[in-house]
Amino acid sequence: LAREALAEAVRETVRANGQENGYIRLVVTRGDGPLGLDPITCPHPRTIIIVADLTVYPAALYASGIRVITAATRQVAAACVDPRIKSLNYLKNVLARLEAHAAGATEALMLNAEGFVAECTADNVFALRGNRLLTPPATEGALDGITRAVMRDLAHAEGLRWCEERLGRYDLFVADECFLTGTGAEVVPVVALDGRQIGTGTPGPVTRRLSAALHT
């Protein structure tokens, strides 16, 4: 589909759904074809447009904050697969999320092959130290998500310094505040990592302000 035809198909799906607020997921697959890995054998790609309600976390967790563990499952190195690619291959993320469930946590932090923070299973990671808002760069394996980009503008409006740099778990342990962002999740406070309290152990004031700003 051409760009405008695709945009109209999305609008048509939204109109047919009748929702004023919802989540749009656009999926493009290689379409029908024989068994095998070669996409050239599938000349007719398939486009799927999904419009639905999406609740990633229960409302109570936005008020209390979530507990996160560090997964043994690592993020694929950026040199192997470009983290800017938004694909349906979530196997490593699913494995990490299962680790979180087994540990009684809500989410799992994924490190890259060098042991630095990449992202969580479906969200970008942020740590606040003073007026510095820290987040891993995409080169560490983090997806350059939509909400992450919006957060950059909101941080500047709040007078925060936006800092993309390598982060270890220690940087999260000693952070004043920590939170995750995602298109569906929005802004999710993190109050503990691997059983260690972060900040006051409650959602911090900057996290709450950024969350409120995202909705204005």
Feature-to-residue mapping (PLM):
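Conserved alpha/beta cores of soluble small-molecule-handling proteins
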Residues: 1-109, 113-116, 143, 153-216
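Glycine- and Gly-Pro-enriched alpha-helical subdomains that act as flexible
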Residues: 108-109, 116-139, 144
